[in-house]
């Protein structure tokens, strides 16, 4: 028990040290004090846009510094309680302290990852699209496995999800789906998942039990809020309505409530059929279009930088980012960071935090 407690304490202390540097606690505290003075001045609201910007910055700094101080305080309290429990040989209390420190180390690791979020839209909700690759039923099944993996990942992080659009495969799985992920920093957690995913396994659809390779792609883009301006002109849009697809039965939708919107200049398409109301589906499809166009613009900027660094293909939407091998051995490997694990079951059940953390760490300077 003593060894486990020491290990958890070491992990938390390492996280606190990294967070101290990442947050630049002293400078952030000084900036927060300055912002408190600025936002207390009534004349600030003469420029509402600037006032809102400063209030967002203040709120963000307060949240991060409060979380850091709470983490530090909780560790201090646990260590003091442990010292008393050790002196009294109180095994029950020591066992509870071990569990508390384990939970605290998980919180610290998550906070450490979130401090790597630096993008304008990292705090927003997001959309996740999954599309099966060539290969029919095999790829359709792989796409459905990926959908479950990401739904479980969102659940692990405490996010809510909505399936906005889904097209089933003929025999099994799905051809495509769009999921809305709702929660603070959802885009920050999911944004590195854009790319092509490769699965190697013994096919459940092949009578000869052959080993098969399947591909599916994912694309993540942030939901746009009022703080990010995206201009879309009506003349650039083509809006089509159609009957929502489904398995039939008494609840089958017999009206043209599904909506597809095409942005003609870019060829970008979004569609929604999750609601029986055409009006609501149109509003959701429009929100998705804004998000896609924002992500395309961000990708253009990224590509421009990558061209200068000769690494453009590493960030291309079509680039293979991860392989999942279930036969002849078990291994999931991220091809960008080289991070890998043999816990394929855990990964497919949504355990993706380490993959995300490794990617974010690499993006701010070196592989983790």
Swiss-Prot record:
It is found in: Cytoplasm. The modification N5-methylglutamine is found at residue 250. Keywords: Cytoplasm, Methylation, Protein biosynthesis. It holds the Pfam family PCRF. The keyword Membrane does not apply. PANTHER family: CLASS I PEPTIDE CHAIN RELEASE FACTOR (PTHR43116:SF3), PEPTIDE CHAIN RELEASE FACTOR 2 (PTHR43116). This is Peptide chain release factor 2. It comes from Rickettsia africae (strain ESF-5). The gene is prfB.
């Amino acid at each position: 028990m003593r060894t486990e407690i020491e290990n958890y304490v070491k992990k938390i202390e390492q996280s606190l040290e990294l967070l101290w540097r990442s947050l630049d606690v002293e400078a952030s505290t000084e900036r927060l004090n300055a912002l408190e003075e600025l936002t207390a001045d009534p004349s600030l609201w003469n420029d509402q846009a600037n006032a809102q910007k400063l209030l967002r910055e203040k709120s963000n700094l307060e949240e991060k510094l409060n979380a850091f101080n709470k983490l530090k305080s909780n560790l201090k309290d646990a260590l003091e309680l442990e010292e008393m429990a050790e002196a009294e040989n109180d095994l029950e209390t020591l066992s509870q302290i071990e569990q508390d420190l384990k939970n605290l180390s998980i919180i610290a690791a998550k906070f450490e990852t979130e401090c790597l979020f630096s993008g304008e839209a990292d705090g927003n909700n997001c959309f996740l699209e999954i599309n099966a690759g060539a290969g029919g039923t095999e790829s359709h099944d792989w796409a459905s496995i990926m959908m479950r993996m990401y739904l479980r990942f969102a659940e692990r992080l405490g996010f809510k999800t909505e399936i906005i659009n889904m097209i089933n495969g003929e025999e099994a799985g799905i051809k495509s789906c769009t999921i809305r992920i709702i929660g603070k920093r959802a885009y920050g957690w999911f944004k590195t998942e854009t790319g092509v995913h490769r699965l190697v396994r013994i096919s459940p659809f092949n009578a000869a039990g052959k080993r098969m390779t399947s591909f599916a792609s994912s694309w993540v883009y942030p939901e746009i809020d009022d703080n990010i301006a995206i201009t879309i002109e009506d003349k650039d849009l083509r809006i089509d309505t159609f009957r929502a697809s489904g398995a039939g039965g008494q609840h089958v939708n017999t009206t043209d409530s599904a909506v597809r919107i095409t942005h003609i200049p870019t060829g970008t398409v979004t569609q929604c059929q999750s609601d029986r109301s055409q009006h609501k589906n149109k509003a959701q499809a429009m929100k998705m279009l804004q998000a896609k166009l924002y992500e395309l613009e961000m990708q253009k900027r990224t590509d421009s930088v990558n061209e200068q660094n000769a690494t453009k293909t590493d960030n291309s939407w079509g680039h293979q980012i991860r392989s999942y091998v279930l036969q002849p051995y078990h291994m999931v490997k991220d091809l960008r960071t080289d991070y890998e694990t043999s816990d394929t079951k855990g990964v497919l059940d949504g355990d993706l935090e380490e993959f995300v953390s490794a990617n974010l760490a690499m993006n701010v300077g070196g592989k983790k």
